[in-house]
Amino acid sequence: MGTPASVVSEPPPWQAPIEARGRKQASANIFQDAELLQIQALFQRSGDQLAEERAQIIWECAGDHRVAEALKRLRRKRPPRQKPLGHSLHHCSRLRILEPHSALANPQSATETASSEQYLHSRKKSARIRRNWRKSGPTSYLHQIRH
C-alpha cells in the first residue's frame, strides 16, 4: 500500500503558512480538558434525559478511544422548537369539548369515557416502549462501553 494522499500533500511545518503554524492542534478527545459540570451542561442543553450519568461516564473514561468512537456515533438531540403562534394552536387542537346534554344526562359515563381513553393511551405508550426496548440506538453506545 502507498502513502495516503493527505500525508503526501501536506507541506512540512516549516513551510506551512504563518497563520496555520499559530493554530492549536486538533484533539481526538474534545472532552480532554473539560470539567464534569461543563460536560453535564452540554448534554442537558442537547435535551438528554440521562445527562448527569453520561457526563460522569465520559469524565471517568476521558482517555479511552472507545468513548471517542461512541461520541462520534452519538447524535445530538434537540428539544422540539416552539413557534409563538403555532404553539398555542397546537394545544387547542388537542382539546375535546364534551356535549353539554350528554354530560348533564349521565355524568358517570363522561368520567368512564375519559378514564378509558387514558387507559388506551397508556397501553399504546407501554407497547411502544416494549417494542423499542431492545433496539440499539446512538445513545446506547455509552452504556455498552461502561457495562
Curated annotation (Swiss-Prot):
Residues 1-24, 104-147 are annotated as: Disordered. InterPro entries: AVPI1, Avpi1/C8orf4_dom. The keyword Cell cycle applies. It holds the Pfam family TC1. One of its GO terms (biological process) is positive regulation of MAPK cascade. Residues 105-119, 137-147 have a biased composition (Polar residues). It comes from the Eukaryota. Keywords: Cell cycle. Residues 121-134 have a biased composition (Basic residues). May be involved in MAP kinase activation, epithelial sodium channel (ENaC) down-regulation and cell cycling. This is Arginine vasopressin-induced protein 1. It comes from Homo sapiens. The gene is AVPI1.
